[in-house]
């Protein structure tokens, strides 16, 4: 088997969806079997490969086709200013990508912004949704216990507005529980992505000015999602509050919750081995 790397799995598709006309989506695509689409978060410099390179190998080895798209306006995908809430537009992008790749149905894995996209996809395209795995998803409105936005989201917007290596360090320090995991390689790679795509940063701010984060809230519709769902959370998440996990399992018909201790907002990276075991078991047996 060809070694999995960003370059060996990289490809582009062109989609045509509402708000995304003749739009190029970049993705990494590896393996054969049932499709698992992993949707990344919304921090500056984020992308499919950088969010999930600790997960793609075990999922491919377990017999899945793993697809890591760059969301519209991120990394190598085309630039865009959005006039609708981002979770919905990103869900349309996933649907368009599936059409282009000839995929009828897929399991969805979504972190933060990617979780919001997964929730919107499950609502808009239930017949094309397999199982759903969420990690600290956005798009769930107010918190019972925390003032919103939380500390991490404030730093995220600061980094979008005033990109600097120092602000990136500040955000990553809040991002993860164990700050020793913030290697120079991770820091420099993320910073390089930020510098490579200044248009993406400006467009994210413009989109947020047009459509505020409060518009992402799909809480009133959670009962419509019939897909089997595994909700995971970092106990120490400083971006999205843990009580949102309880909101999900209280309102979705078939959802369960797993909380990782000593874990921030990036469970699939901070606790990659445990996350891979848990989620692969859920896909096979959940």
Swiss-Prot record:
InterPro entries: AB_hydrolase_1, AB_hydrolase_fold, AB_hydrolase_sf, HOPD_hydrolase_BphD. Its EC number is 3.7.1.8. Coiled coil: none annotated. GO terms for molecular function: 2,6-dioxo-6-phenylhexa-3-enoate hydrolase activity; 2-hydroxy-6-oxonona-2,4-dienedioate hydrolase activity; monoacylglycerol lipase activity. The active site is at residue 265. GO terms for biological process: acylglycerol catabolic process; biphenyl catabolic process. Catalyzes an unusual C-C bond hydrolysis of 2-hydroxy-6-oxo-6-phenylhexa-2,4-dienoic acid (HOPDA) to produce benzoic acid and 2-hydroxy-2,4-pentadienoic acid (HPD). HAMAP family: Biphenyl_BphD. Belongs to the AB hydrolase superfamily. BphD family. This is 2-hydroxy-6-oxo-6-phenylhexa-2,4-dienoate hydrolase. The gene is bphD.
């Amino acid at each position: 088997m060809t070694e999995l790397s960003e370059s060996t799995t990289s490809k582009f598709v062109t989609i045509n969806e509402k708000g995304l006309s003749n739009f190029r989506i970049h993705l990494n695509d590896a393996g054969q079997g049932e499709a698992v689409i992993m949707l990344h978060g919304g921090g500056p410099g984020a992308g499919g490969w950088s969010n999930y390179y600790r997960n793609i190998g075990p999922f491919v080895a377990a017999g899945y086709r793993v697809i890591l798209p760059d969301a519209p306006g991120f990394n190598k995908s085309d630039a865009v200013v959005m006039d609708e809430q981002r979770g919905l537009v990103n869900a349309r992008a996933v649907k368009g990508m599936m059409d282009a790749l000839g995929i009828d149905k897929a399991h969805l894995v979504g972190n933060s912004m990617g979780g919001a996209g997964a929730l919107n996809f499950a609502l808009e395209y239930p017949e094309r949704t397999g199982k759903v795995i969420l990690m600290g998803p956005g798009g769930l409105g107010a918190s019972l216990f925390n003032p919103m936005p939380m500390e991490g989201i404030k730093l995220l917007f600061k980094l979008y507005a005033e990109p600097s290596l120092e602000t990136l360090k500040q955000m990553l320090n809040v991002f993860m529980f164990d700050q020793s995991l913030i290697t120079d390689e991770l820091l420099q790679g993320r910073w390089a992505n930020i510098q490579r795509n200044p248009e993406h940063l400006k467009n994210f701010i413009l989109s947020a000015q047009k459509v505020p984060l409060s518009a992402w809230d799909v809480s009133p519709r959670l009962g419509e999602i019939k897909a089997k769902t595994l909700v995971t959370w970092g106990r120490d998440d400083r971006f999205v509050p843990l009580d949102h996990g309880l909101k999900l399992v209280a309102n979705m018909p078939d959802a369960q919750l797993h909380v990782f201790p000593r874990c921030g907002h990036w469970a699939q990276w901070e606790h990659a081995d445990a996350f891979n075991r848990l989620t692969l078991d859920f896909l096979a047996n959940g």
